[in-house]
């Protein structure tokens, strides 16, 4: 385990909560391949008090009445999205990897380092004008996020916000998503 450093904190959750979050993000070297430093958020999810503070802070940041549904991006985004949806009293909609949804779905592909991946959302996931908060655990290059934002709009939703727990600022995801606002609790 190596130390995680907070280089920037954004949002209304506050520095104290962000520092607690940072202390619960573990660096796992050489995962999933040599040379990659994986940021493991599972200890954060396992700490009920800190996780509750994070979820409540995100709901406060946007306001309970500013979104009608929460989209979670497969897979760890499901954990965060479901908790936010529950706290706000709205529904949760999964954006899944290709072939995982049982009904007719929209799909969007995005580039990976060596290939391409595809995400899907049910075509009937939203009604026209549905305000949707899009949530993921980590923002890296922004490919997954951009594909998801495009899917929400194709399915009739209006993106009310995009939030992540951890932004890997050095990978440029925020710039890729511009001019959309990105709410990141913690940026490294």
Curated annotation (Swiss-Prot):
Pathway assigned in UniProt: Purine metabolism; AMP biosynthesis via salvage pathway; AMP from adenine: step 1/1
Catalytic activity: AMP + diphosphate = 5-phospho-alpha-D-ribose 1-diphosphate + adenine
Main location: cytoplasm
Biological-process GO terms, alphabetical: adenine salvage; AMP salvage; purine ribonucleoside salvage
GO molecular function, one term: adenine binding
Keywords, alphabetical: Cytoplasm, Glycosyltransferase, Purine salvage, Transferase
Annotated Pfam families: Pribosyltran
PROSITE patterns: PUR_PYR_PR_TRANSFER
Compartments reported by the entry: Cytoplasm
GO cellular component annotations of the record: cytoplasm
Top-rank lineage group of the source organism: Bacteria
Cystine residue pairs: none
E.C. numbers: 2.4.2.7
Family per similarity comment: Belongs to the purine/pyrimidine phosphoribosyltransferase family.
Subunit architecture: Homodimer.
Enzyme class: transferase
Role according to the record: Catalyzes a salvage reaction resulting in the formation of AMP, that is energically less costly than de novo synthesis.
HAMAP family: Aden_phosphoribosyltr
PANTHER family documented for this protein: ADENINE PHOSPHORIBOSYLTRANSFERASE (PTHR32315:SF3)
Protein's name according to its UniProt entry: Adenine phosphoribosyltransferase
InterPro entries: Ade_phspho_trans, PRibTrfase_dom, PRTase-like, UPRTase/APRTase
